[in-house]
């Protein structure tokens, strides 16, 4: 039986997977029939995370090939949002810096919205006291 699956490459703690069409009886990283794409889970910055040859995959699926669960998930992810699937992630430092910037913006916005509310609150009690005086009369 022919299967579309991941073949691991890359170095220690730095995985890189080729998406291959292979005979199920062959080893995971062994002999394959055709290479139809790749998946780089450690992609950063401008690196492409997922690349698939859709025509060849559909050809093999029409021929009766089965997909592994992970490959099936990757195909769905690519069909759902191609830009998100291909976009690489951020480095740890970049992510922390971005979070700090967003927190600072949110804090500035919160302070800016509190100041007008405080001014309105100062003006509001005289209006309420006038309304209360009007009710008493």
Curated annotation (Swiss-Prot):
Residue ranges under compositional bias (Basic and acidic residues)? 80-99, 111-125
Known Gene3D superfamilies for this protein?
3.30.1320.10
Tell me where on the tree of life, at the top rank, the source sits: Bacteria
| Residues passing through the membrane, by range | none
Give the GO molecular function terms: structural constituent of ribosome
**GO cellular component terms, A-Z:** cytoplasm; small ribosomal subunit
Alphabetized UniProt keyword annotations: Ribonucleoprotein, Ribosomal protein
**Do the record's keywords include Ribosomal protein?**
yes
Composition skew (Low complexity), residue ranges: 126-137
**Record region (Disordered):** 80-137
Q: Which InterPro entries match?
A: Ribosomal_bS16, Ribosomal_bS16_dom_sf
Instruction: Establish whether keyword NAD is in the entry.
Output: no
Q: Which Pfam families match?
A: Ribosomal_S16
GO biological process per UniProt: translation
Q: Which family does it belong to?
A: Belongs to the bacterial ribosomal protein bS16 family.
What is the protein named?
Answer: Small ribosomal subunit protein bS16
């Amino acid at each position: 039986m022919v299967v579309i699956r991941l073949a691991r490459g890359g170095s220690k703690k730095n995985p890189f997977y080729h998406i291959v069409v292979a005979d199920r009886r062959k080893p995971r990283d062994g002999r394959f029939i055709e290479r139809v794409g790749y998946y780089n889970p450690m992609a950063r910055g401008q690196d492409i995370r997922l690349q698939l040859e859709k025509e060849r995959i559909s050809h093999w699926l029409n021929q009766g090939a089965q997909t592994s669960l992970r490959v099936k998930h990757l195909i769905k992810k690519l069909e759902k949002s191609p830009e998100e699937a291909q976009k690489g992630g951020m480095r740890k430092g970049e992510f922390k810096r971005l979070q700090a910037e967003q927190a600072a913006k949110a804090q500035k916005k919160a302070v800016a919205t509190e100041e007008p509310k405080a001014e309105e609150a100062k003006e509001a009690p005289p209006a309420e006291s006038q309304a209360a005086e009007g009710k008493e009369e």
